């Protein structure tokens, strides 16, 4: 199986290595030519995944059209706000066969359209089967060959099962799911909830308070799932894509979202933070707007959105996170 990964950030690079170790033939593309040059010369990606060696057998490709040729599976590993431009590039090359499954690994919501990542891809690549790959998988651990498990969700149950089996390995377990909407909702909201947990811990309020935020956050995932799809798959809520990823993101110092919240809770000025790689910061505003459109109240997500807009201070946010 030839797998093409578009995006050589931390997760795209780590996933490329994990899939290569699963005996896949892997091609990796990046818009950042310096990243590709360093990978080609040293096998390292010091910008996004320092200290980790990438096998020289992974093919490094500088242009999208060449990367798409002969691909049997396409994985998109770029920030959500860059997905539309990338999908337009893919579509304009006309090099992607309509039978090739497209797997999105972005955990966000498009700010302008309020569409989840999979919805953006379905709009721009309507002929290709689209799946969402999500779950508790830190790039730094994946690239070292440590065990992880994820969910592959899509509308085609049999194809999801087939892909999950082919992409899995002895250390990377991928389970198929048909809860295409619920998995995406969980993957987006968990980042916002992680920021909230980081703030609580940073303020010195302890893990009891953090657990309160997690429980409230799960209720908000359920509320959005119900409003978007009129049903809730309990196995998704308590499974890898929601609870599993939520626990990892809310407890790991390696989580950018948790670290972002932690710094805010400790008093660091939000304006001084570079949040370009913090998906939860991007998603908070969009989810706040989406909740208004859906007519639902999400106290945790709303509090983080208002904080980032400068409408609440951290003490007011704590009150809303724990007691509103």
Swiss-Prot record:
Keyword entries, A-Z: Cytoplasm, Lipid biosynthesis, Lipid metabolism, NAD, NADP, Nucleotide-binding, Oxidoreductase, Phospholipid biosynthesis, Phospholipid metabolism
Binding site for sn-glycerol 3-phosphate: 107, 135, 190, 245, 255-257
Catalytic activity: sn-glycerol 3-phosphate + NAD(+) = dihydroxyacetone phosphate + NADH + H(+); sn-glycerol 3-phosphate + NADP(+) = dihydroxyacetone phosphate + NADPH + H(+)
UniProt pathway: Membrane lipid metabolism; glycerophospholipid metabolism
HAMAP family xref list: NAD_Glyc3P_dehydrog (MF_00394)
Protein role: Catalyzes the reduction of the glycolytic intermediate dihydroxyacetone phosphate (DHAP) to sn-glycerol 3-phosphate (G3P), the key precursor for phospholipid synthesis.
Name of this protein: Glycerol-3-phosphate dehydrogenase [NAD(P)+]
Organism field: Anaplasma phagocytophilum (strain HZ)
């Amino acid at each position: 199986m030839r797998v093409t990964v578009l995006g050589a950030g931390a997760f795209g690079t780590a996933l490329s290595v994990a899939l290569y170790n699963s005996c896949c033939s892997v091609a990796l593309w990046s818009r950042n030519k310096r990243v590709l040059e360093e990978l080609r010369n040293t096998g390292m990606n010091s910008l996004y995944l320092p200290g980790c060696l990438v096998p020289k057998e992974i093919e490094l490709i500088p242009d999208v059209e060449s990367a798409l040729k002969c691909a049997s599976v396409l994985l998109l590993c770029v920030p959500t706000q860059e997905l539309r431009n990338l999908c337009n590039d893919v579509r304009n090359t006309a090099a992607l066969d309509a039978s090739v499954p497209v797997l999105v690994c972005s955990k966000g919501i498009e700010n302008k359209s309020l569409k989840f990542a999979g919805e953006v891809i379905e709009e721009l690549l309507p002929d290709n089967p689209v799946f969402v790959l999500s779950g508790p998988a830190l790039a730094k651990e994946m690239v070292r060959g440590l065990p992880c498990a994820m969910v592959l969700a899509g509308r085609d149950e049999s194809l999801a099962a087939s892909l999950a089996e082919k992409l899995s390995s002895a250390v990377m377990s991928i389970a198929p799911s048909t809860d295409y909407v619920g998995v995406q909702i969980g993957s987006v909201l968990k980042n916002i909830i992680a920021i909230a947990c980081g703030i609580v811990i940073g303020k010195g309020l302890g893990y009891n308070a953090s657990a309160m935020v997690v429980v409230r956050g799960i209720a908000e995932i359920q509320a959005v799932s119900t409003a978007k799809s009129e049903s809730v798959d309990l196995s998704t809520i308590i499974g890898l894509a929601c609870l599993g990823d939520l626990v990892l993101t809310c407890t790991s110092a390696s989580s950018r979202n948790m670290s972002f919240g932690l710094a805010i809770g400790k008093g660091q000025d939000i304006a001084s933070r570079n949040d370009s790689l913090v998906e939860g910061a991007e998603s908070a505003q969009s989810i706040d707007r989406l909740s208004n459109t859906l007519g639902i109240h999400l106290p945790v997500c709303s509090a983080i959105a208002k904080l980032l807009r400068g409408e609440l201070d951290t003490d007011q946010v704590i009150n809303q996170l724990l007691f509103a």
